[in-house]
């Protein structure tokens, strides 16, 4: 149930999230899984039910003591009933080890009363950008994500690729789809965010979600007319797409999924667009310019057609923009020597002319969700293997009537073709939207030696993942 009501305040400033920063090359914190005052599962940090932004440099170590303070018996429902209130952490997008005590979501699991001790070693050559952390207990991931158990991670150093951001005011915006399915005043909440009836797909359905930004419904973001700011936006929704648009202004995208655009194409470090699709788990980092103060302006999401079998993703306002002073952030790298920017521009010719090394086909029926006809089982053998030090050509095939965002742990991939047609601007991603009845071709980057071990790939509509649309991959 949504933690805000239709009678709540409007024009509340977007919350400034607490931050945890590096001290002597180590970031340390204690995070709790608990139940908040609204009865929802929640992260707690320093006595508050809020997830901090974790800021870390390449080469640093992240230490988290994660304590499961959830009750033994849950009052909520899960895809695999009954809920066990088990939990763990996934460091989404980070190119780190899948083995304990790092990004192990298969064997590291905390039951109520247990504590997990994470020691995550960020490689010194890790790309800078926006990443995030969220729980990943198979069968209960959707419920915990919908309750808001997620937070942002910033790997410092974006100014190496885009020098302008060094002196820009930065906004970290965690956007979550919140359920209003059982909220008595749901219609009033939809009016508060100017939600429009879905007009791009399932017109007969009413959306059961509204979006919050940093935990607030339709907050205010301060930006002066003509002022340039650096916005880092994560779609932390369990099952909702965003199609981001800024009134009166374009978005100058500089990074997607924590990867600077310059990483693949140094000559084109920015992409200027009217709006941008961000699937669940996707991230967008953009320079924005404050709109003219003479007219109302907002950050909004447009309607997204998710297919005849998909859920409605209605257009609505995410945040209002208001004139207001902001202070440039102090550069984080003042006393840190970072490596020069690295680039990885692949020659795609050999991949385009070859048959895929692996094809992942996403299907669904009334009994569940599948990859290559198989439902995920925790004790199953890996569906595929990859030799560390290589690239692989993968094709993702969506044989269903709804969109699926495909995510793989530990690595990024270069998405270069959709439905067999070469994309004009290939991009490095860790989560890609796969169109209804369509295909996406990608080059998987398995060259990093730290990824050795058992990992996962899955649909990031987490209800689909919970119900079987996930598989193991062994990096060897």
Pin down the residues of each PLM region.
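Low-complexity, Pro/Ser/Thr- and charge-rich linker/hinge segments at domain boundaries
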Residues: 21, 156-172, 324-351
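Divalent metal-coordination and catalytic microenvironments
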Residues: 31, 64, 89, 135, ...
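Non-cytosolic beta-sheet module surface loops
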Residues: 56, 66-68, 234-237, 246, ...
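C-terminal substrate/ligand-recognition segments
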Residues: 348, 357-415, 430-452
